[in-house]
């Protein structure tokens, strides 16, 4: 047999490799990945790398502008607030209650919503109809308004705000998973799997979940963005984290009256919140596009 007639078989790249190639070549997605990794590191080590304590006050250095300003000091890179506290230290320490708290809330809402949504999507009849009406009722209430109502009864505290945001995100997550599972169950490949003898659990695990991953990632990133904004909004309204907590929303609300005197005390926490939400959305969109490319 001649050797030149033997060819090596080329294996097509797998789903994960295709998805990673798509994700790696997407510049906004990589920006979101590195940015979210930086936020995660700040949530863990932000309090340790802060140059000063969150409540450490410096007499005679109140309302000091950032270091690049004419009257700024290098020792206080982002300036100080009205009590002489270092703004950079408070921003670094405030990543944990704002972004870290939002991540915990989103993770809990995702796990509970995934279980309830899959169970609701796989059932039919009266139970599905009752759950559908309950979810529609809860979804008619804005998430921030629902969180404010819960905090009004429980009292202002960061843990109460996190519970309120979780309670506001849960119906949206359940509804999204329910709709995706219900739509997938009506497709032909699920009917073919049932005729082939597959159980409901196998269909949900091996057929439904891989096909709703892209939509689920979109909902998770949307929920994380909403959680960051809602926790910051409750802190801004003095219903969440209480002063002297360095939570970004509480910092923003405390410095609001200084917007004309010391605008950096308002702009920097607001910029941190905006940048966090932007990075989360960039990462989520990149993951969704990569998953769709890998599945296709």
From Swiss-Prot:
Induction: Part of the sapA-sapB-sapC-sapD-sapF operon, RNA detected in mid-log phase cells.
Keywords for the protein's UniProt record, in alphabetical order: Cell inner membrane, Cell membrane, Membrane, Peptide transport, Protein transport, Transmembrane, Transmembrane helix, Transport
GO BP terms: peptide transport; protein transport
Disruption phenotype: Loss of resistance to protamine.
Residue ranges annotated for the ABC transmembrane type-1 domain, each copy included: 99-284
Classification via SUPFAM superfamilies: MetI-like (SSF161098)
GO cellular component: plasma membrane
Residue runs in coiled coils: none
Predominant cellular place of this UniProt entry's protein: membrane
Transmembrane parts of this sequence: 29-49, 99-119, 134-154, 197-217, 223-243, 258-278
One GO MF term: putrescine transmembrane transporter activity
Ranges in the topological domain labelled Cytoplasmic: 1-28, 120-133, 218-222, 279-296
Residue intervals on the Periplasmic side: 50-98, 155-196, 244-257
Name of the protein described by the UniProt record: Peptide transport system permease protein SapC
Species in which this protein is naturally found: Salmonella typhimurium (strain LT2 / SGSC1412 / ATCC 700720)
Gene: sapC
């Amino acid at each position: 047999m001649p050797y030149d007639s033997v060819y090596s078989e080329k294996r097509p790249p797998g789903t994960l490799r295709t998805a990673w190639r798509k994700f790696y070549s997407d510049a906004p997605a990589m920006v979101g990945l590195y940015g979210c990794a930086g936020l995660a590191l700040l949530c863990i080590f932000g309090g340790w790398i802060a140059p000063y304590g969150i409540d450490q006050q410096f007499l005679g250095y109140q309302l000091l502008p950032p270091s690049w300003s004419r009257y700024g000091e290098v020792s206080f890179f982002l300036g100080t607030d009205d009590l002489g506290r270092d703004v950079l230290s408070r921003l670094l320490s405030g990543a944990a209650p704002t972004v870290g708290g939002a991540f915990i809330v989103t993770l809990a809402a995702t796990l509970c919503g995934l279980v309830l949504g899959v169970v609701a999507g796989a059932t039919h009849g009266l139970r599905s109809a009752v759950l559908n009406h309950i979810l529609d009722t809860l979804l008619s209430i804005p998430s921030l308004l629902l969180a404010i109502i819960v905090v009004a009864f429980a009292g202002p505290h960061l843990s109460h705000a996190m519970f309120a945001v979780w309670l506001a995100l849960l119906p949206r997550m359940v509804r999204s998973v329910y709709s995706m599972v219900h739509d997938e169950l009506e497709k032909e490949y699920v009917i073919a799997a049932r005729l082939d003898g597959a159980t409901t659990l196998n269909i949900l695990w091996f057929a439904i979940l891989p096909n709703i991953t892209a939509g689920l990632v979109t909902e998770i990133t949307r929920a994380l963005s909403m959680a960051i904004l809602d926790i910051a909004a409750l802190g801004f309204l003095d219903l969440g984290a209480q002063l002297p907590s360095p939570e970004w929303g509480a910092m923003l609300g405390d410095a609001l009256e200084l917007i004309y005197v010391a605008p950096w005390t308002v702009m920097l926490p607001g910029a941190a919140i905006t940048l966090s939400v932007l990075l989360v959305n960039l990462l989520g969109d990149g993951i969704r596009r990569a998953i769709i490319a890998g599945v296709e």
